[in-house]
A protein has these predicted regions:
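FAD-site-proximal beta/loop scaffold in flavoenzymes
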Residues: 1-68
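Alpha-helix initiation/capping motif
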Residues: 3-8, 72-75, 112
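Short C-terminal domain-edge/linker segments immediately following a structured domain
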Residues: 24-28, 51-52, 64-70, 138-140, ...
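Solvent-exposed alpha-helices and their adjacent loops that cap or buttress functional pockets
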Residues: 28-29, 33, 75-76, 122-123
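Rossmann-like dinucleotide-binding cores of NAD(P)H-dependent redox enzymes
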Residues: 43-51, 59-98
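Flexible, glycine-rich terminal cap/loop adjacent to redox cofactors
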Residues: 79, 84-193
Length: 193
């Protein structure tokens, strides 16, 4: 939990709201020359988010404060999360309920690990991949995985969302190694209508 409210940051001209240092998309604070990143300023209390923000700050520190054309922005569109339990849980993007609440016309596919050769060989009866896409455009809206190596299996889905690949492009635009567990992602993609 951020403790920015305890830093007395206002003394340096740094604005704080709800216990967090306020930053813009370049990670700049309200005080000229002062950047912030990680738990002190981000609503995402995740190390990989802080790593991303650190790369943004590292680049932007070398730019003139007003030269936003040379700066890079922090991209928080598709922040993934993983829980390293047994089984692992990983997620990125919208849940089915969130997509419905936004009034989106969606397609949902739940694929069991045991439906692919690797999952069958592991005798996996609980692992699943759940994908949510926008019907019509095929745009991936969310991915949720529970099972062995969920934190690794979700990575290509994060990439697809970040780079704007549709479910069909991702499913058919590359080779999927057989027999390997990522085939469960391929089959989920192919099962979307």
């Amino acid at each position: 939990v951020s403790n920015a409210d305890l830093l007395d940051a206002e003394q340096a001209g740094v604005d704080v709201e709800d216990g967090r240092v306020i930053v813009d998309e370049y990670q700049r604070t309200s005080a000229r020359g002062v950047f912030a990143l990680g738990d002190v300023s981000s609503p995402y209390l995740l190390k990989h988010v802080a790593n991303h923000e650190a790369r943004v700050v590292q680049h932007n520190l070398l730019c003139d404060w007003e030269d936003t054309q040379s700066m890079i922005v922090t991209d928080h569109r598709y922040v993934p999360a993983a829980v390293f339990t047994d089984p692992q849980i990983a997620a990125v993007g919208l849940t089915e309920n969130q997509a419905v609440a936004k009034g989106l016309d969606i397609s949902v596919k739940i694929q069991d690990y045991g439906d692919v050769a690797y999952g069958w060989a592991m005798e996996d009866t609980s692992g699943i991949v759940k994908l949510i896409t926008e019907r019509g455009s095929g745009r991936l809206l969310g991915a949720h995985i529970m099972g062995y190596q969920a934190s690794s299996l979700i990575q290509p889905l994060i990439q697809a969302m970040s780079f704007g690949l549709t479910a069909a492009e991702m499913a058919r635009g590359q080779y999927w190694i057989h027999p390997a567990l990522p085939e469960v992602v391929e089959n989920a993609l192919l099962g979307l209508r």
